[in-house]
Amino acid sequence: MDGRVAIVTGASRGIGRHIAERFAAEGAAVALVARTVAPGTSRLPGSLDEVVDRILASGGRAAAIPADLTVAEDVETIVARAEQALGPADTLVNNAGVNFYGPALDLPDRRYSVMYQIMVHTPFRLTQLAVPGMVKRGRGWVLNITSKQARHPIGPPYPGWASDGCVAYGMCKAAVDRLTTGLAAELHGTGVSVNALGTSGLVMTPGVAVVSPHTPDNAPVEPDEAMADAALMVCGAAPGTMTGRIVYSMEVLGRPFPDGPWALSMTY
């Protein structure tokens, strides 16, 4: 990653934080995008200031790019602000996500809109803003963070996990998968790769900890660093050899990992 400039959304905590810190440790300058700037200003632990401080203390390069991904004016300036701080971006990681558990028929429109804005519209728009420069320079990497919830449950009869309150979340991640494969086809031959990466198991991020009553008791937990390691491998691959792929962390790392109904293995 030496000499690379990466934009990572949702980088104040959880998977985004781990990816940002790992990329920085490998030599990339990282623009960290999130809403929480200072410690103690969110109900969840983690902030941009803390992640930037850790990266700088380790000898890396990083810049905080505060943004509310539900606000169009914020989204429109992310790429320009990142490039002003660190230089032209050649790597974009669309990681930011949110979920509101509950039956689809009871999901308030406001919550649905927030989910769609953060996980579908913003990745699409950031891609539109960042990728033309990558194409012009002849190289680039787009990594979309997906989920096995994007897959289709098979039934009837349907297993218990099919009614776990994740219909809207799965819809959004399915859109991300289609963005990945479609854009990879459009950009083939330009030197820009587009891939999607999901977790193989449960990652106990601060956000997941809050909604832990909704997680299956038998869900295997993968190491915190697995997604960061896998993201590094995907974004380190030559664009001509790996693009249009939807892969999962432990698969990328070549590590055995239990699968089962909790992980939506019974899918199309």
Question: Each predicted region: which residue ranges?
Answer:
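The beta1-alpha1 cofactor-binding region of Rossmann-like NAD(H)/NADP(H)-dependent oxidoreductases
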Residues: 46, 66-77, 109
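Conserved glycine-rich cofactor-binding loop
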Residues: 5, 12-13
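Substrate-binding pocket helix/loop in short-chain dehydrogenase/reductase
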Residues: 103-104, 108-113
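A short, exposed helix-loop element centered on a Lys and neighboring polar residues
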Residues: 127-128, 181
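Catalytic loop of short-chain dehydrogenase/reductase
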Residues: 143-189, 201-203
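Conserved glycine-rich Rossmann-like NAD(P)H-binding loop of the short-chain dehydrogenase/reductase
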Residues: 26-50
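C-terminal helical subdomain
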Residues: 174, 189, 196-197, 214-268
